[in-house]
Amino acid sequence: MQSNLIPHTHKHLSLLTIYRAPFGKFNKFLTQLEEILQTIRNLKLDFIICEDININHLNESSKRSQFDAVLMSYKLISTVTFPTRTENNSNSTTDNIFIYTFMFENYTVSPSIKRLSDHNVQMIIIHIPQRQLDVHLTCYNILLI
């Protein structure tokens, strides 16, 4: 698993990016993810997760259920409901953006046409009136060949 936490102190929002290889050890990934989420919770950071963990969110599966359960325990929800990758006439949503259910209620997620990658770009715009700012965050998952 590869992850980065990018603090954005001006708007008090951090971005956690996560990548899990398709054939990585899933249980180890879940353990590491929980450790990272617990650390972030202890630091009291507001954050968003952009991920490519190679679990198709369009289909029900054991891995998806386990992953979703971990995120739900931290009050994080999936926002991407459209395919993020199309290959051989098959659609999948292996990339996603997760946000806090209690903090970000007014948001828009939209796809953007792929230009640099085999995945489509997901863009999220979060409207936060109580803080008098809008957070614009674009999550790119780029495969370099």
Residue ranges and their predicted role:
Residues 20-22, 54-56, 103-104, 129-131:
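Short, solvent-exposed loop/turn segments at secondary-structure junctions
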Residues 29-102:
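Metal-dependent phosphoesterases centered on the DNase I-like endonuclease/exonuclease/phosphatase
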Residues 28-31, 60-63, 110-112, 136-139:
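Short coil/turn segments at secondary-structure boundaries
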